[in-house]
Amino acid sequence: MKYKVVIAYDGTGFSGWQYQENAVGVQQVVEEVLAYLEGEPVRIFGSSRTDAGVHAKGFVGHFRLTKPIPPKNLVRAMNSRLPESVRILKASYAEDRFDARQIGRAHV
């Protein structure tokens, strides 16, 4: 099952969105929670990348789970395990053709 999520995060203390070997990115903490829920590694694809210390509101990502979880339950489950600085604002099922990397972006 493919999901779309809308994420908000305070980038303070993070190396940016993208996973990095020697630092903690937001992607890493989200993927750790998804792996916990799925029981195996899950890759999330984000709509863009942010630099270290940059905040995001309305950041979009997509991923696949083999164990279906209703979107409202997914939001609650993820937020219960994520740090307070990272929140899942909304989750929904996504069409197979949806790709968060291909949507528009705006910087403020």
Regions from the PLM with identified roles:
Residues 1-107:
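Structured-RNA-binding interfaces characteristic of tRNA pseudouridine synthases
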